[in-house]
């Protein structure tokens, strides 16, 4: 455990940041999960709406450094690809 007052303060701040960042990561996963559920249910409109809601959240968390920018891009790309495939299957 930290001995000096400044080290104790830094430990407290680090714990606060850790729990807040965990909450934000959980929120991103929930938004992604909502898109995946809509895709699995083959509900194109709901999937598009969920994706539209998820993209700004994913981008914001990437800007804040909660998730890596490449991971954010990968999630958006894959989700959008699944939605496009769902739309093409519905059109055919």
Swiss-Prot record:
Keywords: Ribonucleoprotein, Ribosomal protein, RNA-binding, rRNA-binding. Residues 1-23 are annotated as: Disordered. GO terms for biological process: translation. GO terms for cellular component: cytosol; small ribosomal subunit. GO terms for molecular function: small ribosomal subunit rRNA binding; structural constituent of ribosome. Binds directly to 16S ribosomal RNA. Belongs to the bacterial ribosomal protein bS20 family. This is Small ribosomal subunit protein bS20. It comes from Stutzerimonas stutzeri (strain A1501). The lineage of its organism: Bacteria, Pseudomonadati, Pseudomonadota, Gammaproteobacteria, Pseudomonadales. The gene is rpsT.
């Amino acid at each position: 455990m930290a001995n000096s007052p400044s080290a104790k303060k830094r430990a407290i701040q680090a714990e606060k940041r850790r729990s807040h960042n965990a909450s934000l990561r959980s929120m991103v996963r929930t938004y992604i999960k909502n898109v995946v559920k809509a895709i699995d249910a083959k509900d194109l409109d709901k999937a598009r709406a969920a994706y539209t809601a998820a993209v700004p959240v994913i981008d914001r968390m990437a800007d804040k450094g909660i998730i890596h920018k490449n991971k954010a891009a990968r999630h958006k790309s894959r989700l959008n690809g699944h939605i496009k495939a769902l739309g093409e299957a519905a059109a055919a």
